[in-house]
């Protein structure tokens, strides 16, 4: 049955632009957009339900394309210690940092991880998020990476959202592989990835290419394994130093390379040629008080598509609001509101390989959209907080919180 959503204005975000339709309407049929356009051009038809949006602005549902939403515990005490002058290295040496999250995640049951993640993600839903990517990477062995990926699949079953799972086993070196990074990478490639993929738990494969994680050569080993399994790849790259990770990602036609503060112009050109999306993570940049900015002008100059994401994680970006990330993207990285909104809609969809079905409001695409109590789409980026979403629609059905 067809449902009519009328009396609204629409920012479709086609081609990464507002692409306004004023005095508009949307017709949904099942989970898809059947028709979209000016209300005066609405075809004569019979509708099972008519919804008056009362002049609201409508945007595509938000897509959070880089998160670590499943984890045990939190690191708020470490946050306070850092502000008291304790260095990250000192925290890590005392058993804190990512090691503490690995311990807490390993100790937690599937049910505990699921319940804590659902609380966080429901907050994001209320902010307009309808699609989310979630990474593993706090288990760091087969049993616990599997546990995390099973929880991610369960989130997709429990919530009316599109949920994509990414295996990030190559996130950090687990304690049982201390000083044996090559052996751990071999374990990922010969044991973990093939088994997890065979169980249908993996949509994409990610790795952390950095001096404190894994080298480009080690990451390439992971990428080759993913490629042999038919899985797309993504990469944490150039966050703290320039190792050429983003160029490596481009060579393997990665969906995205993420962080990118230290990427070079050659890296940018390589990503432009491969079509790899640049995912910027201003929440981590903000919390870590970084001073090295991603090369925004170069990315734009060379036509690299820019996405934004929360990077929700317990250590460096405990961000539960993608709208706050929008403002950070504009304020810190000087993206225009239009560029920022493209970064959490159509460009974020491209970073997940979903651009044919998600990310913009067009006939035939999935009916994920948000109605906003605003006078112009730039307000979504401008306001810090506030109850702006009037309705969140997922697969053609309004989400009731």
UniProtKB/Swiss-Prot annotation:
Binding locations of N-formimidoyl-L-glutamate: 138, 313, 315
Main subcellular location of this protein, as a coarse class: cytoplasm
Note describing how the cofactor binds: Binds 1 zinc or iron ion per subunit.
Subcellular location: Cytoplasm
Binding-site list for 4-imidazolone-5-propanoate: 75, 138, 171, 239, 316
Gene Ontology biological process terms from the UniProt entry: L-histidine catabolic process to glutamate and formamide; L-histidine catabolic process to glutamate and formate
Binding site for Fe(3+): 66, 68, 236, 311
Top EC category: hydrolase
An example molecular function term from Gene Ontology annotations: imidazolonepropionase activity
Pathway the protein acts in: Amino-acid degradation; L-histidine degradation into L-glutamate; N-formimidoyl-L-glutamate from L-histidine: step 3/3
Known role: Catalyzes the hydrolytic cleavage of the carbon-nitrogen bond in imidazolone-5-propanoate to yield N-formimidoyl-L-glutamate. It is the third step in the universal histidine degradation pathway.
The name this protein goes by in its record: Imidazolonepropionase
Lineage: Bacteria, Pseudomonadati, Pseudomonadota, Gammaproteobacteria, Moraxellales
């Amino acid at each position: 049955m067809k449902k009519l959503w009328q009396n609204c204005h629409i920012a479709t975000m086609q081609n990464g632009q507002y692409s306004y339709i004023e005095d508009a309407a949307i017709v949904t049929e099942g989970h898809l957009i059947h028709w979209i356009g000016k209300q005066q051009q609405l075809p004569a038809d019979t509708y099972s339900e008519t919804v008056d949006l009362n002049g609201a602005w409508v945007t595509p549902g938000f897509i959070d394309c880089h998160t670590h939403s499943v984890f045990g515990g939190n690191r708020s005490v470490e946050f306070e210690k850092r502000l008291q002058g304790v260095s990250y290295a000192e925290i890590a040496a005392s058993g804190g940092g990512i090691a503490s999250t690995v311990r807490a995640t390993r100790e937690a049951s599937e049910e505990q991880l699921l319940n804590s993640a659902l609380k966080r993600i429901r907050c994001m839903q209320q902010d307009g998020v309808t699609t989310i990517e979630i990474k593993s990477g706090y288990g760091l062995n087969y049993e616990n990476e599997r546990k995390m990926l099973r929880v991610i699949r369960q989130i997709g079953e429990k919530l009316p959202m599109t949920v994509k799972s990414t295996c990030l086993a190559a996130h950090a070196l687990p304690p049982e592989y201390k000083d044996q990074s090559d052996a751990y990478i071999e374990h990922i490639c010969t044991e973990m990835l093939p088994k997890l993929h065979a169980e249908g738990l993996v949509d994409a494969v990610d790795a952390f290419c950095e001096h404190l994680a894994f080298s480009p050569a080690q990451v390439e080993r992971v990428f080759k394994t993913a490629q042999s399994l038919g899985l797309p790849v993504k990469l944490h790259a150039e966050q703290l130093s320039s190792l050429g990770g983003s160029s490596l990602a481009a060579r393997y036609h990665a969906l995205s390379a993420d962080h990118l503060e230290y990427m070079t112009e050659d890296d940018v050109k390589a990503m432009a040629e491969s079509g790899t999306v640049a995912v910027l993570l201003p929440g981590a940049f903000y919390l870590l008080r970084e001073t090295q900015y991603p090369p925004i002008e170069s990315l734009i100059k060379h036509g690299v598509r820019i996405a934004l994401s929360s990077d929700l994680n317990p250590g460096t970006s405990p961000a539960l609001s993608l709208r706050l990330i929008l403002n950070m993207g504009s304020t810190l990285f000087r993206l225009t509101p239009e560029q920022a909104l493209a970064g959490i809609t159509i460009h974020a969809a491209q970073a997940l390989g979903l651009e044919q079905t998600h990310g913009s409001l067009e006939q035939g695409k999935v009916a994920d959209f948000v109605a906003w109590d605003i006078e112009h789409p730039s307000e979504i980026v401008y306001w810090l907080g506030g109850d702006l979403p009037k309705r969140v629609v997922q697969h053609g059905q309004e989400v009731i919180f």
